[in-house]
Amino acid sequence: MLLFLARLMAWLPLSWLQTAGRLIGLAAYRYPSRYQRRLRRHTRWAGYDDPAFVRRAAAETGAMMAEIPKIWWRTEQCLAKVVSDQEPIVQAALAEGRGVLYLTPHLGCFEITARHLTRYGPLTVMFRPARQAILQPLVESSRDMHNLHAVPANRHGVREFVRALRRGEAVGMLPDQVPGEGEGIWLPFFGEYALTMTLAARLALQTRVAVILTAGERLPRGRGWRMHYLRLPEPLPETVEATAIAINQAMETLIRRFPEQYLWGYNRYKQPDEAPPHPDEAEPAPADTGPAAAGAPTPPAPPGAATHHER
């Protein structure tokens, strides 16, 4: 039944879906909840204190959810609405023939991003199974696409990633997901410590491929999406930690291009039970890494700043 409804939604105009999604997103935000508190807290930590900004962010989250069925089952129609003036960044990286690691944060429409990138050649992406079993048929049916190969987020998937990169192909992943047990370190993200995955940094250092951050900005009135690309400067830092910091900094730069479309309600700063110890509460919080996509570790903020983390 859920699959039928989702397929039915795919036939509605994109502008209708996004408008309905924005209304639902605003309604969900107005209800006092953990989500509302988290959304306000995360936007404030990043320097966005304006209540109107938070409401726009909540609305864009709803639009992101509502447009997914159309992207999954009316893919070609949606791809025709993708525009970009930054395609030479991708073309230059692919021309080097050493593979490309695409990093797509929870920004804009990350569902359209992967599908657009298949226009350049085979793309292997990593996924996590849906937590709700009822959603699994929807997720599985959405992965059937030419040039798009999905692998699970486990050791098998990592091996598939390495093989694809060594063939000179492209792989893609979400770099701002909270990592699993033993796969993350605490690093600055918008001036606060966040448990940061090391997989992207390890892959980049192991394979020496081009690293490009990418996101699809949602355009108004259902006009489609604008693709953004940001290539990580080379040579990369020599250590996994420094490279992961550089990735976080580049993500901040990309997010600040259209910050209201970042998924601020995602529990990015949580501390899983199996996570390494959070930095001492007495230590100063890391400074906001700002817009620079550099590879050097960020210096700490002045003493007295507060450090935050969530469960």
Predicted regions: what is each one?
Residues 1-104, 138-140, 145-147, 298, ...:
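Membrane-anchoring hydrophobic helices of lipid-metabolizing enzymes
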Residues 10-15, 61-63, 84-86, 109-113, ...:
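Short hydrophobic/aromatic-rich motifs at helix boundaries and adjacent loops
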Residues 22-24, 28-31, 46-58, 94-95, ...:
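Non-catalytic C-terminal accessory region of glycerolipid acyltransferases
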Residues 36-38, 129-133, 193-197:
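Active-site metal-coordination segments of metallo-dependent hydrolases
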Residues 76-82, 128, 147-153, 189-191, ...:
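Short, flexible loop segments at the rims of nucleotide/cofactor-binding pockets, characterized by
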Residues 87-91, 114-115, 136-140, 161-162, ...:
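Short amphipathic alpha-helical segments and helix-helix/interface helices
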Residues 96-155, 181-185, 218, 222:
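Catalytic core of membrane glycerolipid acyltransferases/transacylases, capturing the structured
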